[in-house]
Structure formats: C-alpha cells, structure tokens
Amino acid sequence: RDNARTPMQWTGGENAGFTAGTPWLRVNPNYTAINVEKETIDPNSVLNFYKKLIALRKDPEYKETVVYGALEPFMEDRHNLMAYYRKGDKTLLVVGNYQWEEQEITLPSECKKVLINNYPDMVLEGNSVKLHGYQVLVVELA
C-alpha cells in the first residue's frame, strides 16, 4: 500500500505542507506544480471540477434526478466515449470524451441547459455537439 500513496500535497512548501517533521514516504517531486493550494485558485482545476459536481448533486433543483434518478446508458457502441442519462423529474445527459481527438455526438433532444462543462465553450449546432478532447458535459435535456 505504501507504493500506491504519497503524502498529500497541500502546498508547494517544504514536504508539500504535509508535515513539519519527516514524512514516512517521500513527497512526489511534482508537489510544487500540483497541490491543493494551486488547485484551489485555478477555476479549471480537477479540484474545482469535483466541487462543481458536488454542488450539482446538492442543488435542490437537480438533487432528485442526480441522486435517485434512473441511470441509462447512451451511445454504448462509441469508442472512448462514456455517456449516460440520469432520469428523474428531469433528464440529464452526462458525456465524457476519453480521447485527445474531437468526437461529434447527436443529442437525443434539445439541450435545455449546460450544467457542467470542463471547457469554456460548447460547440452546439442544432442537436449536434462537437466534444473537444477530454471534454466532459452534463446537460439538461428538454
């Protein structure tokens, strides 16, 4: 188990801010570039993306669907694409492009609202969406 984990990288400071003492395991050498302190101030960081996901789960408008809604796969035949519905009092579509190359998908119905997007834009023409490499979307469908 020791080989799988290193001390939490809280800051870019000594021992990554994990301890003032000597840590049992060596700190990952990337701690000056990747740490909680930097992730907190970067609106596009993985940490802040997870905060957005948690906020969506807690949002009273979407909680019923996100927490208790039925999960239905969508576009299972597509390579490097994960897509599924959450259906409850609303219909949400979660789509993740797991490759560097763009992928185009056709939404099954009109996009009512973009709830989460890890890119600053979304290329939408009618019901056709062009996903950037590694783009993740959560959209509410009409």
Locate each region found by the language model:
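Beta-strand-rich binding/interaction modules
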Residues: E102-Y119
